Amino acid sequence: MLRTCLLLFAVFLGFTQLSAQPLVKISGKVTNETGHALPQVTVAILGQSQSTITDALGVYHIYSKSKSFTLKYTFLGYNPVQINIKQDKAGRIIQDVVLSINPNELEQVTITNKQNQLSNTVTINISDLASMPSVSGNFEAILKTMPGVSPNNELSAQYSVRGGSFDENLIYVNDVEISRPVLVRNAQQEGLSFINSDLLSSAKFSAGGFEARYGDKLSSVLDVKYDKPDSSTAILNAGLLGLAFSSKIVTTNSYLLAGIRYKNNSGVLGKQDNKGVYTPNFTDVQLVYNYNLSPEFSVNVLGNFNSGVFRLIPESRETEFGTLNSKVRLDVDYDGEEKDNYQTTGGAVALKFIPRSNYVLKWINSYFNTDEKEHLDVGAWYRFNKAGAGFGSGNTESRIGRYTNYAMNLLTSKTFSSELKSDQTFSSHTFSWGLRYERKDYNDDLNESYKIEQEGVLVDNKDSFYQGNNISIQNKLAIQYYTAYVQDSYGLSATTNLQLGLRGSYNDLSKEFLLSPRLLLAYRPARNNKIFRFTTGVYQQAPDYRSVRDFNGMLNLNQKAQRAYNTSAGLDYAFDGLGTRLKFSSEVYFKYLDRLIPYMMDNVRLKYLAADEAKGYTYGADFSVGGEFVKDLLSYFRVSFMSAKQDVKNDGLGYLKRPTDQRVNFSAYFQDRLLNSPTYKVHLSLLYGSQLPVGSPLAARYSDDFHIPAYKRADIGFSKDFLDDFSIKKPVFLDKYFSSFTAYVEVFNLLNINNTVSYLWLKDADNVQYAVPNYLTSRRLNLKLVLKFKNSK
């Protein structure tokens, strides 16, 4: 199927190139206003799928298939030029062009914006979201190409930043903090994350050293803002994995954003080693309504309904693992089924008051209710087939066993928050403050059991803290949080800026008063193409239900806040190279954690050792470089190095690797146009994450002597925009109703690499333990259409 579709796509591309012999040869030189040659300028003939680029001397040659045509010259940072040419007969012509600088476009690739200078954040290019090939379809897929983020699971919206856990990341949508489900144990159960990419106007991400205005987590912050449209429009995204529709409606004093998304990735999940009937259905509905009562006062309402139903009737499994000379195959026959339900409803109301042009006051109130139901009743007969070099030749021995996995878990969580915050700008200062109250209520009914038998003999699993034989417990917990912050950003000189902030917090669980000072110093030399940053601060994460619930379901109500001391130094440098404007960013960091709650990680499920306490440290460096090698298509490359270790107090083992100790991470997102057909584009995503430490649940609880292999993945997409600016002969019907009509062909996991996400730990009758790899998704073809309807005033 995949080979046939790719062949058809290649034939289609080839067919579009069929044409008559060239009639006109155009040559010339492209220079700037001072007469200097401009290399790498794109020269295209609109409507003919012909394009080229200028050489190092600014010279180009191109052929036209007709005698009447339009030439278009484009180069990043310069105004585009179009020239209409009409020839009476075939031949050769000389056409020299002078491009003028576009200062507005140059501003987009400089780093002198003061807001970015005073914030240790990276602005995410949201125009990449629709084009980036992603099997999950969630916004968070783009985060895994960000500096400091470790990739290890393409199905999950969860992410680890600089050695931190999934629970250490802050997410804000329109200043409302968003939480994630608690019970999810496998990424295939995850549905649609909260963020609707079609409604976005901006997104910023910080991998550490963020401002005092943001909340009390240890690792990162993602700050997302939804659009404030000035005209009405709609977007339809339809593909093999789901459907999404969003609408933006603008009236005189208000606007409405509406988005509905549906996802069903059964075609992806069905190709895993676990064969069976997969029925995943995920739906998300969001509404944002903003009304301007007056020029000074407005009200903004956000509503959300998110539902996920995951059902699996497993049938069989066949997994081969081991070395080339000592292979083992696990064969499994299943009975039973799994059915999980996740539902979140809620919203927020924000009142915004602007009494003066330099003063903004916001009052934000939110409430979310999440119901999670996990029903798992699966049994499995399994057989190990072992052999040496003759594996598969019949020289095998078999051992039969059975394991059963049961869970009936119900969790209801309710979160209410109210926050008052203000920003006021003076001549050289921006002063901010905020007050926040939050209450979280949890009602948890936890029932789990797991057992293994070999040839009718029950394996004693009483020493397994990780799986647990039987858990049956009911918990109720309410936690109240009180926080406040002040922050001042001001210019010490024309080249130096300082930001000082202080957070204070109290919670009625640990009953601690916490103070977290933070500092950011930025220096911009007079040349205006560099920024040096230094940040230092204290980050404290108060206990919540996830961290106080031990692996056996018991609650440690005496747990104290986790605390990290973070220091980093970085450089942003913008320069011209490779025919475009490039931005290089680097940052080195050190994070010492004197109070840390250890945990074990299995897929996306974290099991905290809530009764224990640890200390740890993380250090590393992030590097990235990016630019528009082709106009309007941003490409970037990044590499990160890191070491993360922890020492659990009183265990006598000293420092061991943290579960997130991924030493090397690399990512690349590269985009290009086909040289002779610029309306066709290619989008390539590459991810690499080195091995992760893991230990057997039946061994010492802090063991890290085993590893999950390195994560390696390549996804590629091909797109064709039928209304691209490079095409002058646009389909009349499409041009009448749509501003963009783009078709995508995507290949997920292009190299079909088996990436391991976790292990199934089993023993045979000889008490030999096996770590059976649980593989992630294999190669998969996807087709989709993204339609953007024309704006209506």
Annotated model-derived regions:
Residues 362-366, 524-526, 561-619, 628, ...:
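Membrane-embedded beta-barrel scaffold of Gram-negative outer-membrane proteins
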Residues 292-308, 336-510, 585-588, 636:
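Face-selective signature of the C-terminal outer-membrane beta-barrel domain
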Residues 29-36, 41-46, 72-78, 88-133, ...:
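Short, acidic, small-residue-rich periplasmic hinge/interaction motif at the N-terminus
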Residues 170, 202-212, 219-227, 233-277, ...:
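Predominantly transmembrane beta-strands of Gram-negative outer membrane beta-barrel pores used
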